[in-house]
């Protein structure tokens, strides 16, 4: 144990077909595969508990994680267009890391520019932000807060093989700053075609007000490119606060970030 501070693992999601021209089955297959990341972390956590010191825990590093679509081949530089589907998957992964922040100490998407689940794309003199960039920008509002356990109640969706169960419609992470009496909630609606009414309550700390940012598109295969760099961008959206509870409707294949003032 004295020789180990961290252990690193990789996880790629490769069952989603092509980057843009994917089917509904491809969509759900890739989204469902991303849940394996939570299984990876849970298994590592169970193993590491046998070796953790009294005040010193082995840190888990996910040093490469990404969607990897079938047309992202080495001869093409592993480039793939990143769509709203990728953003929903990225949000789910980042929520997972937040929920496991007592064990996960560092993560790194593969990669930052042009490769697989990148946040910036460059083509000659043109550069633009992918939908993934905005998910990272939203989730950073958790930084400096205390992670909170999220008790989520939502329907399960059909898997890529048409089976039901095992894929929660919502992915959620939450955090709070007790001194500032503020909270942050990130929610991804994984359903490819249906919205969902979302209600959020901070146990013992009713919400006073909230602001919301929404990353949403009409089609799950929407993406940004040089000729349309702003097709997928976040926008402010309405959120109601009633008796300390947040209420909002989340469109299909969307990611929302709620900044909350608590009583």
Name every feature range the model reports, one short phrase each.
Residues 7, 44, 64, 107, ...:
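Conserved, mostly hydrophobic/aromatic
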Residues 1-35, 58, 63-67, 104-105:
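Aromatic- and acid-rich polysaccharide-binding/catalytic face
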Residues 205-246, 250:
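Acidic, Ser/Thr/Pro-rich beta/coil linker or hinge segments at domain junctions
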Residues 245-263:
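Beta-strand-rich recognition/accessory modules
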Residues 166-206, 212-215, 253-259:
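Carbohydrate-binding surface patches
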Residues 57-172:
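Aromatic/acidic polysaccharide-binding cleft in carbohydrate-active enzymes
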Residues 47-51, 93-97, 124, 170-175, ...:
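Generic recognition of flexible, low-complexity loop/linker segments
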Residues 33-52, 57:
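Gly/Pro-rich turn-and-neighbor structural signature
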């Amino acid at each position: 144990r004295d020789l180990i501070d961290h252990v690193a693992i990789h996880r790629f999601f490769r069952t989603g077909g092509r980057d843009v021209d994917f089917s509904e089955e491809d969509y759900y297959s890739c989204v469902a595969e991303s849940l394996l990341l939570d299984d990876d972390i849970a298994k590592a956590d169970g193993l590491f508990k046998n070796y953790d010191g009294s005040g010193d825990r082995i840190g888990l590093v996910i040093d490469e994680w990404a969607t990897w679509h079938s047309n992202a081949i080495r001869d093409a530089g592993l480039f793939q267009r990143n769509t709203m589907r990728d953003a929903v998957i990225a949000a789910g992964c980042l929520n997972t890391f937040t929920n496991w922040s007592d064990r996960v100490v560092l993560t790194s998407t593969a990669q930052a520019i042009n490769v697989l689940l990148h946040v910036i794309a460059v083509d000659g003199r043109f550069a633009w932000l992918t939908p993934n960039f905005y998910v990272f920008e939203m989730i950073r509002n958790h930084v400096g807060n205390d992670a909170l356990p999220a008790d989520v109640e939502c329907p399960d969706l059909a898997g890529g093989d048409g089976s039901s169960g095992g894929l929660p419609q919502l992915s959620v992470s939450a955090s709070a700053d007790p001194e500032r009496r503020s909270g942050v909630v990130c929610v991804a609606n994984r359903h490819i075609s249906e919205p969902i009414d979302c209600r959020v309550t901070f146990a013992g700390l009713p919400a006073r007000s909230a602001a919301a940012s929404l990353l949403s598109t009409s089609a799950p295969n929407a993406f940004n490119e040089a000729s349309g760099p702003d097709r997928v961008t976040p926008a402010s959206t309405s959120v109601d606060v009633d008796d300390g509870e947040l209420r909002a409707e989340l469109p299909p294949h969307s990611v929302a970030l709620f900044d909350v003032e608590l009583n």
